[in-house]
Amino acid sequence: MALDIKLLDIIACPVCKGKLHYNKAVHELVCRFDKLAYPLEEGIPVLLENRARPLSSDELSS
């Protein structure tokens, strides 16, 4: 199930409250400021800090 792009206008990073970006290739919401990627489960964002994975420097540069 795909993410409803309209959600990106109303949701924010739970850590810094900043804007999230959708990485369609891996179905994750990315916070570049905190260097975290939040998973999507069946199209639903899981915005829990303990479920986020840290982004590598390679991922941040792309």
Swiss-Prot record:
Instruction: List GO terms (cellular component aspect).
Output: cytosol
Q: Which domain of life is it from?
A: Bacteria
Alphabetical list of InterPro entries matching this protein:
Trm112-like
Similarity field: Belongs to the UPF0434 family.
Task: Output this protein's name.
Answer: UPF0434 protein AHA_2776
Q: Which organism is it from?
A: Aeromonas hydrophila subsp. hydrophila (strain ATCC 7966 / DSM 30187 / BCRC 13018 / CCUG 14551 / JCM 1027 / KCTC 2358 / NCIMB 9240 / NCTC 8049)
